[in-house]
Amino acid sequence: MQKMGDCMKKVYSLVGLAKRAGMAVCGEDLIKDCIRYGKSHLIIIAEDASDNTKKSITNSCKYYGASCYIAGTKEDLGHAMGKSHNAAVCITDAGFAKSIENHLQRNTNGGETL
């Protein structure tokens, strides 16, 4: 596991908090449903997610106008969500999404905006 910056640590911490609050969703189909029904406020896709997963979710984000970032790893996102690996996360609360997005924008190690 790579050494991560303070901004990404905060992102993972907030993702975990959102999960415990019931405001984070994982799984490609569930994420695409949230995007489709306007429940998503922020999508984070792991940098090491498969090309098919990235394309599928980013296409949905572009079509429905959802905010999407490619940042972090599957392992780190998974640990934040209480799993071993997780390719993508959808934040369904505007407050959590805004806070996480602020930290993603400050992250100097990545955080590609789509």
Residue spans for each PLM region:
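Signal for well-folded cores of large energy- and translation-related assemblies
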Residues: 16, 36, 62, 82, ...
